Amino acid sequence: MILGVGTDIVYIPRISNLWKKFGIKFLTRVFNQKEIEDSYKYTNFDAQVRHFAKRFAAKEAYVKALGTGFGQSIKMSDIVILNNPYGKPQITVSNSNPIHKIELSISDEKDYAIAFIVIYNANIKL
């Protein structure tokens, strides 16, 4: 059973501007250390910005799917987006309900990054 669907689109230059303005403070407030380390595989700044923009969109899409938004119960850094060995993005959330399964798709084109999330009950076959 589908419990929630969320989508978000991010203007990539916005993420670039935030990073340039606030530096590491921006990154550590929004991203988990593993996500930051994962960006090191990209040697140029633009590729790193795209990496972070897609993950930013995924985090926003996740809380939209939950219907809660960000607040005291969940922070952006509680949501971790990493790729599996095959390149598929996967989401891990601190203190999430273990019976929830989360499917994530992220993409970028020109100045925009987009994410789409479906949360469903893992005990019920789709």
UniProtKB/Swiss-Prot annotation:
UniProt GO BP: fatty acid biosynthetic process; lysine biosynthetic process via aminoadipic acid
MF (Gene Ontology): holo-[acyl-carrier-protein] synthase activity; magnesium ion binding
One GO cellular component, as annotated: cytosol
Keywords, ordered alphabetically: Cytoplasm, Fatty acid biosynthesis, Fatty acid metabolism, Lipid biosynthesis, Lipid metabolism, Magnesium, Metal-binding, Transferase
Compartments it resides in: Cytoplasm
Matching Gene3D superfamilies: 4'-phosphopantetheinyl transferase domain
Coiled coil: none
Pfam families: ACPS (PF01648)
UniProt EC number: 2.7.8.7
Cofactor: Mg(2+)
Top-rank taxon: Bacteria
Binding site for Mg(2+): D8, E60
InterPro entries cross-referenced by the UniProt entry: 4-PPantetheinyl_Trfase_dom, 4-PPantetheinyl_Trfase_dom_sf, ACPS, P-Pant_transferase_sf, Ppantetheine-prot_Trfase_dom
Reaction(s) this enzyme catalyzes, per UniProt: apo-[ACP] + CoA = holo-[ACP] + adenosine 3',5'-bisphosphate + H(+)
Family of the protein in this entry: Belongs to the P-Pant transferase superfamily. AcpS family.
Role played: Transfers the 4'-phosphopantetheine moiety from coenzyme A to a Ser of acyl-carrier-protein.
Name this protein carries in UniProt: Holo-[acyl-carrier-protein] synthase
Organism: Ehrlichia canis (strain Jake)
Gene name in the database record: acpS
